[in-house]
Amino acid sequence: AEFGPSQPFKGAK
């Protein structure tokens, strides 16, 4: 999970 609730800064935007 590159982008998820745990890593919203990984590419959630």
From Swiss-Prot:
Which EC class is this protein assigned?
A: hydrolase
Instruction: Set out the biological process GO terms recorded for this chain's protein.
Output: one-carbon metabolic process
Alphabetically, the GO molecular function entries are: adenosylhomocysteinase activity
Q: What binding details are noted for the cofactor?
A: Binds 1 NAD(+) per subunit.
Catalytic activity, per the record? S-adenosyl-L-homocysteine + H2O = L-homocysteine + adenosine
User: Which pathway or pathways does this protein act in?
Assistant: Amino-acid biosynthesis; L-homocysteine biosynthesis; L-homocysteine from S-adenosyl-L-homocysteine: step 1/1
According to its UniProt record, the EC number is: 3.13.2.1
Its keywords, alphabetically, are: Hydrolase, NAD, One-carbon metabolism
User: What does this protein do, in the record's words?
Assistant: Adenosylhomocysteine is a competitive inhibitor of S-adenosyl-L-methionine-dependent methyl transferase reactions; therefore adenosylhomocysteinase may play a key role in the control of methylations via regulation of the intracellular concentration of adenosylhomocysteine.
Q: Please identify the protein, giving its name as recorded.
A: Adenosylhomocysteinase 2
Give the species this sequence originates from: Populus euphratica
The upper taxonomy is: Eukaryota, Viridiplantae, Streptophyta, Embryophyta, Tracheophyta
